[in-house]
Amino acid sequence: MGSRWSSEEERQPLLGPGLGPGLGASWRSREAAAAALPAAVPGPGRVYGRRWLVLLLFSLLAFVQGLVWNTWGPIQNSARQAYGFSSWDIALLVLWGPIGFLPCFAFMWLLDKRGLRITVLLTSFLMVLGTGLRCIPISDLILKRRLIHGGQMLNGLAGPTVMNAAPFLSTTWFSADERATATAIASMLSYLGGACAFLVGPLVVPAPNGTSPLLAAESSRAHIKDRIEAVLYAEFGVVCLIFSATLAYFPPRPPLPPSVAAASQRLSYRRSVCRLLSNFRFLMIALAYAIPLGVFAGWSGVLDLILTPAHVSQVDAGWIGFWSIVGGCVVGIAMARFADFIRGMLKLILLLLFSGATLSSTWFTLTCLNSITHLPLTTVTLYASCILLGVFLNSSVPIFFELFVETVYPVPEGITCGVVTFLSNMFMGVLLFFLTFYHTELSWFNWCLPGSCLLSLLLILCFRESYDRLYLDVVVSV
């Protein structure tokens, strides 16, 4: 496949000896699955049509979680007038996303020990509580702001599952030639939810009019508040529907595993964490993902705040954010499908994507400094640079996830992706923390984008790829 495999020791414990005829009954734990696999010629796995329903439910949950997380950034000007939010409040509302990743390792443990169903049910229940908390009708604005912050915090706690469990779901339910596509769909829908917040918020909630007389301003404030509450109630209703559907049907795994890798023995939680932290290659590629994606996520969450000095309206900022993420989702799924057909090309795909991301982020940053660079600052240039940046960075997410799992296999997928998304949100949190103190001048925030993309490009260039899980499915099962 054009790449060197990792050490023989890393592949040694994957397949256990012996085979009983009842493979489906034996696959109730990873250890039993390993013992149930044949020592000689494993048969191909079996896939079930219900896998698409499981993927749909999980993807909808991820979509709404991203939508709820990005509720306030696109309508920050309206939220200031309706609830008296400050710039610090707006930054903190976005910051609850990465703060929710602090108990990430607990969710990773739960996913590894109790499986997909229990973890997804807990996640959706937290989202029900969070979105419900924001809808409590209270006239006291101080208490209302606290409830909104509490709701955003609970929704942030759902982030570890919707961001980490996509590769686990794809390995559990999908065959080797569908895994990257399933991972892309499940992981990209969270970003698509954040993109739709750029569209829904500004279209439903009107922007404030600072030139209105006092009485008209009070009427406008009440109208804006009513429209924001309509959005909050709608999000609460959708979350309740998804929770009910998940409670009714979301099986933890199929009766039979879809591939050899899905049935093979994995490392324990403790051994997995130790393996990840001692693997220099993994740490290298994890930083290549975490730094630019963390910076970009924080930048996207306050895009309206960043574009306000450039005299970009709330609606235009919403459309820019929407198309940048939608383009990334479409290209990401297309890239993942391409990776399913032509295997062993993940590093090359990432090099191409981050070359484009470095150029487009530099273009955007220099455009915002038009008083120095004299580059044209127009709606077209802002649209083009932001959309290209979103396409290149967002589409890299599923490719990164597949490369992580291949690099450190047999570490479980949920633990692997949990570590890297924790790192990404840590960088995002640090950036937004500084934003709460340095929010009057934001050119430093823009320069973080090309700097992080260039650093990631260099790390990917030095990375030596390997495909241990693919080796197991393609070579061992033949």
From Swiss-Prot:
Domain of life (superkingdom): Eukaryota
Topology of the protein relative to the lipid bilayer: Multi-pass membrane protein
Positions occupied by motif Di-leucine motif: 14-15
Processing and modification events after translation: Cleaved in lysosomes by cathepsin L between Leu-214 and Ala-261, generating a N-glycosylated N-terminal and a non-glycosylated C-terminal fragment.
Organ and tissue specificity: Ubiquitous. Expressed in proximal tubular cells of the kidney. Highly expressed in the placenta, brain and heart.
Localization: Lysosome membrane
Lumenal topological domain residue ranges: 73-89, 139-155, 206-229, 303-314, 369-384, 436-442
Residues glycosylated per entry: N209
Keyword flag Transport: yes
Gene Ontology MF: a single term: transmembrane transporter activity
Membrane-crossing residue ranges in chain numbering: 52-72, 90-110, 118-138, 156-176, 185-205, 230-250, 282-302, 315-335, 348-368, 385-405, 415-435, 443-463
Cytoplasmic side: 1-51, 111-117, 177-184, 251-281, 336-347, 406-414, 464-478
Main location: membrane
A cellular-component GO term for this protein: intracellular membrane-bounded organelle
Xref: SUPFAM superfamilies: MFS general substrate transporter (SSF103473)
Protein keywords: Chromosomal rearrangement, Glycoprotein, Lysosome, Membrane, Transmembrane, Transmembrane helix, Transport
GO biological process, one term: pyridoxine transport
Catalysed reaction, written as an equation: pyridoxine(out) + n H(+)(out) = pyridoxine(in) + n H(+)(in)
Function: Mediates H(+)-dependent pyridoxine transport.
Family, per entry: Belongs to the major facilitator superfamily.
Implicated disorder: A chromosomal aberration involving DIRC2 has been found in a family with renal carcinoma. Translocation t(2;3)(q35;q21).
Stated name of the protein: Solute carrier family 49 member 4
UniProt organism field: Homo sapiens
